[in-house]
Regions:
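Glycine-rich phosphate/cofactor-binding loops in nucleotide/flavin-utilizing enzymes
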Residues: 2, 70, 74-75, 93, ...
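Glycine-rich beta->alpha junctions and the first turn(s) of the following alpha-helix
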Residues: 2-7, 11, 194-288, 358
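Internal helix-loop-helix
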Residues: 49-117, 159-165, 284, 291, ...
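A short, Trp-centered hydrophobic/proline-enriched beta-strand micro-motif
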Residues: 117-125, 169
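A short core secondary-structure module
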Residues: 147, 151-197
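Glycine-rich phosphate/pyrophosphate-binding beta-alpha loops
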Residues: 155-160, 202-203, 357-362
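Short, charged, amphipathic alpha-helical segments
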Residues: 274-279, 305-313
């Protein structure tokens, strides 16, 4: 069976590839390499909103273009290929979850601002002592009239230092089983009692934080969905997040960088260079087909748990292997005293370190494999 984009999708892909290639200046790229959520990043997101591109995958009723999931994947892939950081948590996970579970008041307030690129969310799930066992969270929210009083701590909150709001998982019924009694609150980061400290990751960038909640008063109308039934929202949001963690464009961008360098240095006939580039191109194609498969299924039903996890596992593990292999190629054949080679080697080093997070961001791959086995293959859950 031959699978390919139709004519209109190919035209969209070409338009987006051109758009993202010229979206950022060299200085803006250099800044966002280290400061992933700073003022330059926010300006770029506003630029995308002003140009009307943030709504590619959103329904028209919420201000979007009304395109389907395949077009949304094209948008994400082309941004990844150009190494343009999207407001992915806000645009691709919180936004769609609000569309399904939010109140009319929440939708009318948050969704237009997201599409304009003016409002940013961070996800407050992980906690210091609970590892990947999200359901064991201990951040609590106690009802006090028209407010919830929130106390606790989260860790590895991506963009927490620059977010306008935190999509926060809290325990609202401490006596319920651990997967129950959880709720989702939207916390305004300007509220008294909210604070953060930076976590600098191995790529040298500041894009995650520890966030703290000390008697933060959250209005009750910032409860998303039904109180004590937040686990459903968490799984919906995480399924969207896992899909976005495996775009084929990330591999395509890697190929473009190294191929251009190898061609300029007359290395395309070197056996190890050709082998590495062929593997990279083939992996991009497989990843792209997997993206399309998930997108096609999503057109008629919610994101499948097993499909979302499979996309995340494949994309995150293959990209790490490819970066390792291509770093060896550049190191073997390149001269770091040459500016072009030094620039490529530095870029590969930063990206390789940054991609390490992909195997546990959005849920560690060991758990993703169990989700694939149980939900996709009907196998029994591993005893605990």
């Amino acid at each position: 069976m031959f699978v390919a984009l139709n004519a209109s999708q190919q035209a969209l892909q070409e338009e987006l590839r051109t758009y993202f290639a010229q979206l950022m200046t060299a200085d803006e790229r250099a800044t966002t390499t280290i400061d992933r959520h700073g003022t330059v990043y926010r300006e770029i997101v506003r630029r995308m909103g002003h140009d009307g591109w943030l709504g590619v995958g959103w329904p028209k009723e919420f201000g979007g273009h009304g395109f389907g999931p395949i077009e949304q994947h094209i948008f994400v892939n082309e941004a990844a290929r150009a190494d343009v950081q999207l407001p992915s948590v806000t645009l691709q996970t919180v936004g769609p979850t609000l569309q399904t579970f939010g109140t009319d008041e929440q939708k009318s307030f948050f969704l237009p601002k997201i599409l304009c690129g003016e409002l940013h969310f961070a996800i407050g799930y992980s906690e210091p002592d609970n590892g990947t066992d999200l359901a064991s969270l201990r951040t609590i929210a106690v009802r006090d009239g028209d407010y919830f009083i929130v106390n606790g701590q989260k860790t590895f909150t991506t963009g927490g230092h620059s977010a306008d709001y935190i999509w926060l998982a809290v325990r609202t019924d401490p006596d319920a089983p651990k997967h129950k009694g959880i709720s989702i609150l939207i916390v305004d980061t300007r509220d008294p009692g909210f604070s953060w400290t930076p976590i600098i990751t191995c790529d040298g960038a500041h894009h995650v934080d520890a966030t703290y909640y000390s008697d933060v008063r959250v209005p009750a109308n910032m409860l998303v969905g039904v109180e004590n039934q937040g686990w459903r929202l968490i799984t919906a949001q995480l399924n969207h997040e896992r899909v976005m963690l495996g775009p084929s464009g990330r591999i395509g961008g890697l190929y473009d960088h190294v191929y251009t360098w190898a061609a300029a240095h007359d290395l395309l006939d070197a056996t190890d260079v050709r082998s590495a580039l062929i593997e990279t191109r083939a992996t991009e194609g497989i990843n792209e087909l997997l993206n399309w498969q998930v997108a096609a299924a999503e057109s008629s039903a919610p994101v499948d748990v097993a499909d979302a996890s499979a996309t995340k596992v494949f994309g995150s593990e293959r990209i790490q292997r490819l970066y390792e292999r291509l770093e060896e190629v550049v190191g073997r054949h390149g001269d770091l005293a040459e500016p072009v080679t030094a620039e490529l080697a530095a870029w590969l080093n930063i990206q390789a370190k940054r991609n390490l997070v992909l195997t546990f961001g959005g849920g560690v791959n060991e758990i993703q494999r169990e989700l694939i086995a149980v939900n996709g293959l009907g196998l029994p859950r591993v005893p605990r």
